[in-house]
Amino acid sequence: MASSIWKGLVGIGLFALAHAAFSAAQHRSYMRLTEKEDETLPIDIVLQTLLAFIVACYGIVHIAGEFKDMDATSELRNKTFDTLRNHPSFYVFNHRGRVMFQPPESEDCHRIQAPFSSNSSLKLSKLESMHR
């Protein structure tokens, strides 16, 4: 219930800001027509703009909820050292280490092996006999 009151207050503030902007634009066009371009805005438009801005900001602050502490220790108390700098979205598994750290036997097989090569089948049979 309270949230809808603050949302209504923000809506009223934004509507009042839009009305003040429209009034300022209308006043400016009137000043152009009367050739009095050096005059400032009337005080009622200025006050409406300031009051609407304050009302909208006040409603937004109450909708946003509780503020967090500026000191990060209150948020870091419930985290362990392992999860502190752990960012799983930055893990990369497709890198050159897969090729660099292969056993030498399997590395040769992958380099030399061709689809219809009799030489590659000979090497494979030699490797299989070595592993038995």
UniProtKB/Swiss-Prot annotation:
One of its GO terms (cellular component) is Golgi membrane. GO terms for biological process: magnesium ion transport; protein insertion into ER membrane by stop-transfer membrane-anchor sequence; tail-anchored membrane protein insertion into ER membrane. Its main location: endoplasmic reticulum. Residues 1-3, 64-132 are cytoplasmic. Coiled coil: none annotated. Residues 23-43 are lumenal. It is a multi-pass membrane protein. The chain crosses the membrane at residues 4-22, 44-63. It is found in: Endoplasmic reticulum membrane; Golgi apparatus membrane; Early endosome membrane. GO terms for molecular function: magnesium ion transmembrane transporter activity. Signal peptide: none annotated. It holds the Pfam family MMgT. Keywords: Endoplasmic reticulum, Endosome, Golgi apparatus, Magnesium, Membrane, Transmembrane, Transmembrane helix, Transport. The keyword Metal-binding does not apply. Belongs to the membrane magnesium transporter (TC 1.A.67) family. Part of the endoplasmic reticulum membrane protein complex (EMC) that enables the energy-independent insertion into endoplasmic reticulum membranes of newly synthesized membrane proteins. Preferentially accommodates proteins with transmembrane domains that are weakly hydrophobic or contain destabilizing features such as charged and aromatic residues. Involved in the cotranslational insertion of multi-pass membrane proteins in which stop-transfer membrane-anchor sequences become ER membrane spanning helices. Component of the ER membrane protein complex (EMC). This is ER membrane protein complex subunit 5.
